[in-house]
From Swiss-Prot:
Cofactor(s) named in the record: Mg(2+)
Enzyme class: transferase
UniProt: GTP binding residues: L11, C12, G13, K23, D66, D97
Record organism: Campylobacter jejuni subsp. jejuni serotype O:23/36 (strain 81-176)
Name of protein: Molybdenum cofactor guanylyltransferase
Main location as per UniProt: cytoplasm
Length: 191
């Protein structure tokens, strides 16, 4: 299996409360963070989609909207909505605010898709990264079951589904832009 045979979905539906503004629209090199991620991953994957509660991008991207079945704001709903759009395949899911994840990290996770796992996510010494990994589309119903019980955390899947945590030493590759200072620092590194 090759990366260019797979689909990628960039999650852009977070509340961005710590950032104080919508992270998906932060500007990097004359484009917003969403466009930055879509451009990068379009060179790697078959298709790149954007996941959000509504179309805040004026039809600029292939959008997967959160399902209207549940009136919640959660990563589990986003994952359920994403996986419901695909049939019998792995999908790479990444939060828009993880701009340093790239092909090297993906290639380290890729071999585990051929093994007997349904979830393959990145893990660093300090964190598991549930919004950086491959999820099999067959998990949509399991996500729905959690939502029906008002369980919103993606991490709940890991105890029920065969999951591979792919170990990475470098925390920096999985930088998450939660605060404006982190965004400013990352922006200055791009120059």
């Amino acid at each position: 299996m090759q990366l260019n045979e797979l689909n990628c979905v960039i999650l852009c539906g977070g509340k961005s409360s710590r950032m104080g503004q919508d992270k998906s629209k932060l500007i990097l090199k004359n484009q917003n963070l969403t466009q930055f991620q879509v451009n990068k991953f379009s060179k790697i994957f078959k298709n790149v989609y954007v996941s959000a509660k509504e179309d805040k991008f004026e039809n600029h991207f292939s959008l997967i909207k959160d399902s209207l079945e549940f009136e919640v704001y959660s990563p589990m709903l986003a994952l359920y909505s994403i996986l419901s759009n695909f049939k019998n395949e792995f999908v790479f899911v990444l939060s828009v605010d993880s701009p340093k994840v790239g092909e090297n990290e993906l290639l380290k996770m890729l071999p585990f898709l051929e093994q007997n796992y349904k979830i393959i996510i990145a893990k660093t010494p300090l964190h598991k990264h549930p919004l950086c990994g491959f999820y099999h589309s067959s998990l949509a119903q399991t996500c729905k079951n959690f939502l029906e019980k008002n369980e919103q955390k993606i991490g709940l899947l890991f105890s029920e589904i065969k999951t591979k945590f792919v170990e990475f030493e470098d925390e920096d590759a999985f930088l998450n832009l939660n605060f404006y200072e982190e965004y400013e620092k990352f922006k200055s590194e791009l120059k």
